[in-house]
UniProtKB/Swiss-Prot annotation:
It is an enzyme of class 5 (isomerase). Keywords: Cytoplasm, Isomerase, Manganese, Metal-binding. It is found in: Cytoplasm. InterPro entries: Alkaline_phosphatase_core_sf, DeoB, Metalloenzyme, Phosphopentomutase_DeoB_cap_sf. Binds 2 manganese ions. This is Phosphopentomutase. Mn(2+) 2 binds at D298, H303, H351. The keyword DNA-binding does not apply. Pathway: Carbohydrate degradation; 2-deoxy-D-ribose 1-phosphate degradation; D-glyceraldehyde 3-phosphate and acetaldehyde from 2-deoxy-alpha-D-ribose 1-phosphate: step 1/2. It catalyses: 2-deoxy-alpha-D-ribose 1-phosphate = 2-deoxy-D-ribose 5-phosphate; alpha-D-ribose 1-phosphate = D-ribose 5-phosphate. Its cofactor is Mn(2+). Its main location: cytoplasm. CDD domains: PPM.
């Protein structure tokens, strides 16, 4: 019998809590990640007021220097700790795959200086369209169409760009390059990026519409991912008949592997929280696992190095946390964590190699305190033990510490 009938895992994308022990091996604009501290630096530079996460125990997580504006709680309502990554990467897919039990020993490839000519030329030859070389670099998805959309409308060239994650994205105006044509080009791009030196996690079709100065991306986005190289705990759950619900980009991150119910993409964090709440309210969801990613922290504020915007985004989540809890049942377990860091005060624009926080809450708890410090995969091991399935490659369950 399961200790918790339902477990809900919410990933606050990029909300790290201090440099990891191996941060000296990871860099931003030539600067090692050793001084990165997403939550710490936001609390120092912008101020941070997250009373609902404080109640669970966020301020009690062990740190060399306490969070400046996040107090400790004498009698928290939950259990907390911080977790270390063992995989060789600090991207979204690596973090999520490890959280679900895998050890990624060969990281995906990222292209901070844009994609090599060999790849661009192959895409041009296949598509019969030229590629705008000036867009070939890490770029905001909205900024890239603002900057190059007018040119694409005139010439029909492709907008190919990347990000901090191991992705190749192709933006195309639907009136200039039909969606089905864009999909075929992306399928080809997927076929040539499945091994080194260009092993990419995802190819993303990014259709948009509108006129110069007023472009908007459409719902016709399509992701061409790769499946995890081995079964994750999601697969173990699905194979055992335990329903799994994906909210936000979780389904894309795992290429649908082990997901029995995809609840769709999020338009924003607020929309994602709405979708999570609707998922919690589903009458058929009496037992199982929900997995939510809220990406605005990372996409809108971490990469853009916007501390105040990041702070406000954390405030927004914290303000809505009581709504999530109000829609949980007494025998539900809520786990709040992250997948990597993205310190908005740091050099460069890339993710930062950090510990991630873990907050655990259930109305059924009679105790509280600290969970032993562990690793990302401890989350999946805990989920696995609760539902009576095998773990994946790595992870130690902390289920016994939750009382």
């Amino acid at each position: 019998m399961s200790k918790f009938n339902r477990i809900h895992l919410v990933v606050l994308d990029s909300v790290g809590i201090g440099a990891a022990p191996d941060a000296d091996k990871f860099f931003n604009a030539g600067v090692a990640d050793t001084d990165s501290d997403t939550l710490g630096h936001i609390s120092e530079t912008a101020g941070l007021s997250v009373p609902n996460m404080v109640k669970i125990g966020l301020g009690n997580i062990s740190r060399p220097i306490p969070l400046k504006t996040v107090p400790t709680e004498d009698n928290p309502t939950g259990y907390v700790t911080k977790l270390e990554e063992v995989s060789l990467g600090k991207d979204t897919m690596t973090g999520h795959w490890e959280i679900m039990g895998l050890n990624i020993t060969e990281p995906f490839d990222t292209f901070w200086n844009g994609f090599p000519e060999e790849i661009l030329t192959k895409i041009e030859e296949f598509s019969g369209r030229k590629i705008i070389r000036e867009a070939n670099k890490p770029y905001s998805g909205t900024a890239v169409i603002d900057d190059f959309g007018p040119r694409q409308m005139e010439t029909g060239e492709l907008i190919v760009y990347t990000s901090a994650d191991p992705v190749l994205q192709i933006a195309a105006h639907e009136d200039i390059i039909p969606v089905e044509e864009l999909y075929k080009i992306c399928e080809y791009a997927r076929s040539i990026t499945l091994e080194r030196p260009a092993l990419l996690g995802r190819i993303i079709a990014r259709p948009y519409v509108g006129e110069p100065g007023n472009f908007t991306r459409t719902a016709n986005r399509h992701d061409y991912a790769v499946s995890p190289f081995q079964d994750t705990v999601l697969n173990k759950l699905a194979d055992a008949g335990v329903p799994t619900y994906a909210v936000g980009k979780i389904n894309d991150i795992f290429n649908g592997s082990g997901i029995t119910n995809d609840m769709g993409h999020n338009k924003s964090n607020s929309h994602g929280i709405d979708t999570l709440i609707k998922t919690l309210q589903l009458p058929e969801f009496t037992k199982g696992f929900s997995f939510t990613n809220l990406v605005d922290f990372d996409a809108n504020f971490g990469h853009r190095r916007d501390s105040e915007g990041y702070r406000d985004c954390l405030h927004e989540f914290d303000n809505r946390l009581p709504e999530i809890i109000a829609n949980m049942k007494e025998d539900d377990l809520l786990l709040i964590t992250a997948d990597h860091g993205n310190d908005p005060t740091y050099a460069g624009t890339d993710h930062t190699r950090e510990y991630i926080p873990l907050l655990a809450y259930s109305a059924s708890f009679t105790g509280n305190g600290l969970i032993p410090q562990g690793h990302f995969a401890d989350i999946s091991a805990t989920v696995a033990e609760n539902f009576g399935v095998d773990t994946a490659m790595i992870g130690e369950s902390f289920l016994g510490h939750l009382k």
